[in-house]
Amino acid sequence: MKTQTKVMGGHVLLTVFTLCMLCSGVRAQLSPDIYAKSCPNLVQIVRKQVAIALKAEIRMAASLIRLHFHDCFVNGCDASLLLDGADSEKLAIPNINSARGFEVIDTIKAAVENACPGVVSCADILTLAARDSVVLSGGPGWRVALGRKDGLVANQNSANNLPSPFEPLDAIIAKFVAVNLNITDVVALSGAHTFGQAKCAVFSNRLFNFTGLGNPDATLETSLLSNLQTVCPLGGNSNITAPLDRSTTDTFDNNYFKNLLEGKGLLSSDQILFSSDLAVNTTKKLVEAYSRSQSLFFRDFTCAMIRMGNISNGASGEVRTNCRVINN
């Protein structure tokens, strides 16, 4: 059957039937309509609050989708990342002084609790917020299957093992495979770096002594290298940020992949999808395909988000009233 799409509000909304054909199965206990009676205005409430947050700070869109990614890769999509405490995943190396948007989720949760107390999990709210961040930035939309429970424990050790911008491609692929995602998902989800910012701390290793012999990363385009060396000088402030996509910084599109073809990926983990030796037989052709076809990227990204949103560790959970702490 032909893929059907509807253009709505400047983004592509894939039909539910098409998504069912394209993407692997949704967890049996999840359904887009699970709150149809218990919280009928949920989707509108979340969308409104995300829109307010993005109006206040457009960068928040990328931050919210990153929260969802970092949550799902640890214990499954159970909002364990949102828990405070000494063993919080927020304190793991990939998240500390980096993960952001927790206050936005708190605000959304408060609005949802006001309308439907004790009904909607923080995990579902985070999943919806990630989707809305994409849509409100010009990306594709999809119906989110709901019914996740909030985890009872955080897992800081596992959070320390999240895919890293410093890792080689084979290690990154292995971490995706470990949570039942595939190479297409690796490339499609990396496309979320089409918006947002990154700190000098996570890419400055490419700028001056990448090889250990005093040379920068040879795959980095020369004019971008020169600019980044000015933004992130040796011994400078590692918390300064640079856009992941300089051309369309706040728009969700396929420009990220066009950048990779030109050596303009900001993170090492971005550029290796196209330039590394391993990429030749794994990810390079996908990068090229997505650079040519935004609709193909949107389709595969949507499917990858649905699959990632299905990650579960099978543990029991609850519906937290406060996303930062388990219920008494």
UniProtKB/Swiss-Prot annotation:
Glycans are attached at N182, N209, N239, N281, N310. Its EC number is 1.11.1.7. Slightly expressed in roots. Substrate binds at P163. GO terms for biological process: hydrogen peroxide catabolic process; response to oxidative stress. It is found in: Secreted. The modification Pyrrolidone carboxylic acid is found at Q29. Its main location: secreted. One of its GO terms (molecular function) is heme binding. Disulfide bonds join C39-C116, C72-C77, C122-C323, C200-C232. Binds 1 heme b (iron(II)-protoporphyrin IX) group per subunit. Binds 2 calcium ions per subunit. This is Peroxidase 59. Belongs to the peroxidase family. Classical plant (class III) peroxidase subfamily. Heme b binds at H193. Its cofactor is heme b; Ca(2+). Ca(2+) 1 binds at D71, V74, G76, D78, S80. The active site is at H70. There are 73 peroxidase genes in A.thaliana. GO terms for cellular component: cytoplasm; extracellular region; nucleus. Keywords: Calcium, Disulfide bond, Glycoprotein, Heme, Hydrogen peroxide, Iron, Metal-binding, Oxidoreductase, Peroxidase, Pyrrolidone carboxylic acid, Secreted, Signal. InterPro entries: Haem_peroxidase (IPR002016), Haem_peroxidase_sf (IPR010255), Peroxidase_pln (IPR000823), Peroxidases_AS (IPR019794), Peroxidases_heam-ligand_BS (IPR019793), Secretory_peroxidase (IPR033905). PROSITE patterns: PEROXIDASE_1, PEROXIDASE_2, PEROXIDASE_4. The record marks R66 as: Transition state stabilizer. Removal of H(2)O(2), oxidation of toxic reductants, biosynthesis and degradation of lignin, suberization, auxin catabolism, response to environmental stresses such as wounding, pathogen attack and oxidative stress. These functions might be dependent on each isozyme/isoform in each plant tissue.
